[in-house]
C-alpha cells in the first residue's frame, strides 16, 4: 500500500502545468496585414518550464490586434506552446517585445515575461 501511495504522488508531481490563458478577441490589424521576419534567433522559457526557439529568418503574418499587442501567425510552419497540453500558438508582439501568444484554437491569450525580438518588416 505504501508503494502504491508513493507511485501516485510521483505520478501527480510529474504532470505538467497547464498553459496559462485568458479569453481574447482578435481585432483587425490597423493598416492591414503585414509580414515581418525575425532577424535574430530568440530563445525563451515558458512558465510551464518548456523551452522554445523562434528561428532567425522565420516569417510571420499579422493576423489581428489584441490589447497586449499584435498577433503574428507563422507564414510557413507551426509554433506550439506546451504544458499539460500542446497548443498552436501565434506570437504576440508589442513594441519589439514578445509579450505572449495567441492560441487560435482556444481564442485565448497566454502571457510571457517579455523577450526582445529583432524583426524586419516585409510587405507581401
What is the meaning of each model-derived region?
Residues 21-32:
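Alpha-helical transmembrane signal-anchor/signal-peptide segments
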Residues 16-19:
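Bacterial signal peptide processing site
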Residues 22, 51, 57, 67, ...:
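Residue-level detector of solvent-exposed, low-hydrophobicity positions
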Residues 1-5:
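Positively charged n-region of N-terminal signal peptides that target proteins for export
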Residues 31-95:
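Mature extracytoplasmic domains of secretory-pathway proteins
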Residues 95-124:
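C-terminal partner/receptor-binding element of secreted or periplasmic proteins
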Amino acid at each position: 500500500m505504501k508503494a502504491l501511495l508513493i507511485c501516485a504522488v510521483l505520478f501527480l508531481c510529474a504532470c505538467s502545468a497547464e498553459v496559462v490563458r485568458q479569453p481574447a478577441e482578435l481585432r483587425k490589424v490597423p493598416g492591414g496585414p503585414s509580414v515581418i521576419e525575425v532577424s535574430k534567433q530568440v530563445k525563451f522559457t515558458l512558465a510551464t518550464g518548456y523551452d522554445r526557439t523562434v528561428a532567425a529568418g522565420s516569417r510571420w503574418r499579422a493576423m489581428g490586434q489584441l490589447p497586449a499587442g499584435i498577433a503574428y501567425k507563422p507564414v510557413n510552419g507551426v509554433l506550439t506552446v506546451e504544458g499539460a497540453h500542446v497548443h498552436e500558438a501565434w506570437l504576440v508582439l508589442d513594441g519589439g517585445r514578445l509579450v505572449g501568444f495567441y492560441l487560435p484554437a482556444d481564442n485565448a491569450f497566454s502571457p510571457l515575461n517579455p523577450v526582445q525580438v529583432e524583426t524586419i518588416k516585409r510587405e507581401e
